[in-house]
Amino acid sequence: VVLDVAHPDIEEFIWCKAKEERKARVLEQAGYDMSLDSPDWASIQYQNANNSVRVTDAFMEAVVEGKEWNLTARTDGSVVETVDARALLKDIAEASWQCADPGVQYDTTINAWHTSPNTGRINASNPCSEYMHIDDSACNLSSLNLMKFRKEDGEFDVPMFEHAVDVMFLAQEIIVGYSS
């Protein structure tokens, strides 16, 4: 989940996961089972999301200069609220220190380094940010456990690995084909 630093809900977004994780710690201390398969854990929100705040150079300059920052309506761009830019960045840092979210994406840099800018701007990424591209484009990642290709004698089973790679590529092509 990526939210622009000028979004009117940014303050709530910054703290949403940290607040839920504090709730989880309190419940655990009260004796509730907070293991991942527990029904008690199911009451903790936002745990299956990777949150990031999208910041611009203009925001970072406002932080450096100690300026205020406008939170703007998504519908018409009107200013909904004005906040202290440094305080907002401090909140991002504090929430991230508490629960590892939100991360930060640097919008200006991402779009400056865009490999195909004529296709449109990049507004977000997949959850771990290893794939950056335009809206409505696919990120279909897959992986193979290389230890599964280790033979009993310690050698790497190259033919089996090559076969697995072929199957994975075919599966990815099918996923892309059916997603259209």
Predicted segments, located by residue:
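Active-site cavity-forming subdomains of large catalytic enzyme subunits
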Residues: 1-161, 174-180
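Hydrophobic core segments within long, regular secondary-structure runs in both alpha-
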Residues: 162-172
